[in-house]
From Swiss-Prot:
InterPro entries the UniProt entry points to: MFS, MFS_dom, MFS_Efflux_Transporters, MFS_trans_sf, Sugar_effux_transptr_put
Protein name: Probable sugar efflux transporter
Assigned keywords, A-Z: Cell inner membrane, Cell membrane, Membrane, Sugar transport, Transmembrane, Transmembrane helix, Transport
Topology in membrane: Multi-pass membrane protein
A molecular function (GO) term: carbohydrate transmembrane transporter activity
Transmembrane segments: 15-35, 50-70, 81-101, 103-123, 136-156, 165-185, 209-229, 246-266, 276-296, 298-318, 333-353, 362-382
Family: Belongs to the major facilitator superfamily. SotB (TC 2.A.1.2) family.
CDD domains from the UniProt entry: MFS_NepI_like
Originating species: Pseudomonas paraeruginosa (strain DSM 24068 / PA7)
Gene Ontology cellular-component terms listed: plasma membrane
Job of this protein: Involved in the efflux of sugars. The physiological role may be the reduction of the intracellular concentration of toxic sugars or sugar metabolites.
Keyword tRNA processing recorded: no
Lineage of source species: Bacteria, Pseudomonadati, Pseudomonadota, Gammaproteobacteria, Pseudomonadales
Amino acid sequence: MHSTSETRSGSWLSVIALALAAFIFNTTEFVPVGLLSDIGHSFDMPTSQVGLMLTIYAWVVSLASLPMMLLTRNIERRKLLVGVFLLFIASHVLSGLAWNFPVLMLSRIGIAFAHAVFWAITASLAVRVAPPGQQAKALGLLATGTTLAMVLGIPLGRVVGEALGWRTTFMAIAGLSVLTLLYLVRSLPPLPSQNSGSLRSLPMLFRRPALVCLYILTVVVISAQFTAYSYIEPFARQVAQMGGEATTLLLLLFGGAGIFGSLLFSRYSEAFPRGFLLAAILALGTSLALLLPFSAQPTWLMALSVLWGMSIMCFGLAQQSRVLRLASDATDVAMALFSGLYNVGIGAGALLGSVVSERLGLAAIGYVGAALALAGLLLALFTALRYAGALKTTSL
């Protein structure tokens, strides 16, 4: 059992448990990116149509995040996480058994509901259970779990899918989720709902213009990211003419770069908050603009993926940190909105990438994403200049 003093003093074991859960959830959200071709082959569908499963998943998360958070706001958080994981596991088993694409989509919707609750509460929980004075590092560790999903989860999911079939990938995630659930139950202390906010928090949050601009910026930049990233596997295979192993390595490098992005965030984000965010968006836009030119040489494309992976991780962490600072009195509502809008961006980007792939060809996805990133950079500049005072709030 966990004593009250342990809960109050914080524990790295609890933070690690949440980071493991973050690894699982981010792996399953994006693992279809590496399996689009295989899933399309199983159901005799083009990758542009299969890729819409990313859009539907993301938009279910975006629509469900706030309502699910409000419905569960009074539930003790450890019990809530257990329920979330049980739904998550059952839905993955259904994914592995899916006999047609609609059934696969139904299972993904179940996973999306679990995702909606998980990410609405996890960042604030990591801050709560962290040792005193280590809240920023706790967020960094949570981000490491997210990064490892890109580094190991998605490439390993692709390797397993190619060797044993994509269904096995989903079954393996279900098995790993069972082990993670057991660790969560053992390591987390009782966590009563705290500062979750309510529906009455929404008008208050939307009266904070810096926070509203932050939310809009998130949608724009994440749309830019997923216009290209959603279709990076078919882009690598068809445009860059890379083989299966090289494509897996490309995904591995992209994810691995996120580790360096999280380190950069931990070291420089508080010292240079404005410049850090602007540099991240500029690097992202540059990476997307160079995607097609660098596809002529696989080694160039792999090197570019490192900059790309670092930049999107830096952006996501910077935005998450700002949400927690600007809405410290209603963290769960604010993070539910952030998670929902982040997934609006994912869904919009995946949908736009599908349209671009069909109308202009896969080769154009980077240029369209770069144009959106440029719009995001201009918005970030406006926000930094207009609301500089609000963004200089106290640290976590």
